[in-house]
């Protein structure tokens, strides 16, 4: 049997491949392979992961779910193995896109230059639940959206036009949920106690997957955020700790510490991760993921990058210190060079 060229693939196979793409950028890459693929795959009708639905929590307002993609941008230079981190959001079913800050999700002020997203490395897709604060926890699987809303409830809805019905996924033993993640083809959620739950797609039911992550009694009031992240192929839980400070006679909360936990399968208990090795953890508004530090300008190994109110900061696991990016400071200075990966100097 002879070899089949890319342009000779059957339309049904091309159709199947296109339906598994999760962002418009990936779809554009796919259509650019050859002319038959471009004519077979229509752009607009493929974007199933962008839709408007009235989430029960907001009965009178539309909930807009739109896909977003994280990119690693590199340019021809002596350091071609290093790049910058940027985020792209598809704001409509047309080709319109916004470039966002990877951590805060805020729109980056456009310049007179353009960035060809087909020539940069796409390494992670996610979705953003727009319009409502604290509702950025969204995953997409098998044409179904799963959302954690601001009331810590999980809802799911098919992305097709055949239904606009949201279904709540609930378990009486769980008091509420904080995060949700797609891991190895399955959906997992994190409850308020730091326990992981597994969602059955066939039953649309949820079952506890493991015990709660440990929090010392004196830390309970300060641990106000928990997130899920995949590390070394396993699910881990990230705890974020806050403390109140008086700044100019105003009481404000600031991040003071992070802890990362992984499951010890032999002991069947959570153990604290002492080092992330050569990786850095990115805690974004809608996603948590790890990157190889050596692939990004200034990126610190064994560190956690996060947004604290209006500030971009990094927490170093080796000495538990925090460096905050100074407003209007140059990321090229020695103290601020660890934030170069978020610079848009490539424009």
Curated annotation (Swiss-Prot):
Disulfide bonds: none annotated. InterPro entries: KIB1-4_b-propeller (IPR005174), SCF_F-box_domain (IPR051304). It holds the Pfam family Beta-prop_KIB1-4. Residues 4-51 form the F-box domain. It comes from Arabidopsis thaliana (Mouse-ear cress). This is Probable F-box protein At1g44080.
């Amino acid at each position: 049997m002879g070899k089949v060229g890319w342009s000779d693939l059957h339309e049904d196979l091309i159709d199947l491949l296109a339906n598994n793409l999760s962002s418009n950028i990936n779809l554009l890459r796919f259509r650019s392979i050859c002319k038959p693929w471009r004519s077979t795959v229509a752009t607009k009708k493929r974007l199933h992961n962008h839709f408007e639905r009235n989430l029960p929590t907001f009965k009178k307002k539309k909930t807009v779910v739109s896909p977003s993609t994280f990119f690693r941008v590199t340019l021809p230079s002596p350091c071609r193995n290093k790049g910058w981190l940027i985020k792209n959001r598809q704001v409509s079913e047309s080709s319109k896109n916004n470039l966002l800050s990877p951590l805060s999700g805020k729109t980056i002020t456009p310049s007179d230059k353009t960035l060809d997203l087909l020539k940069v490395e796409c390494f992670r897709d996610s979705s953003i639940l727009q319009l409502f604060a604290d509702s950025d926890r969204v995953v997409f699987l098998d044409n179904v959206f799963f959302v954690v809303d601001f009331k810590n409830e999980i809802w799911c809805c098919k992305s097709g036009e055949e239904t606009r019905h949201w279904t709540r996924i609930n378990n009486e033993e769980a008091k509420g949920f904080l995060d949700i993640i797609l891991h190895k083809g399955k959906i997992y959620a994190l409850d308020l106690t730091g326990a992981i739950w597994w969602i059955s797609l066939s039953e649309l039911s949820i079952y506890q997957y493991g015990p709660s992550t440990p929090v010392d009694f004196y830390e309970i009031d300060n641990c106000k955020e928990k997130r899920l992240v995949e590390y070394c192929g396993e699910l881990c839980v990230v705890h974020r700790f806050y403390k109140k400070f008086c700044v100019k006679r105003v009481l404000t909360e600031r991040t003071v510490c992070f802890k990362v936990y992984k499951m010890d399968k032999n002991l069947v208990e959570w153990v604290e991760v002492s080092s992330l090795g050569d990786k850095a953890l990115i805690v974004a508004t809608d996603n948590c993921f790890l990157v190889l530090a050596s692939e990004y300008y200034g990126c610190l190994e064994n560190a956690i990058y996060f947004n604290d109110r209006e500030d971009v900061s990094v927490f170093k696991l080796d000495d538990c210190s925090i460096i905050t990016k100074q407003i209007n400071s140059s990321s090229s200075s020695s103290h601020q060079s660890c934030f170069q990966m978020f610079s848009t100097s490539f424009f």
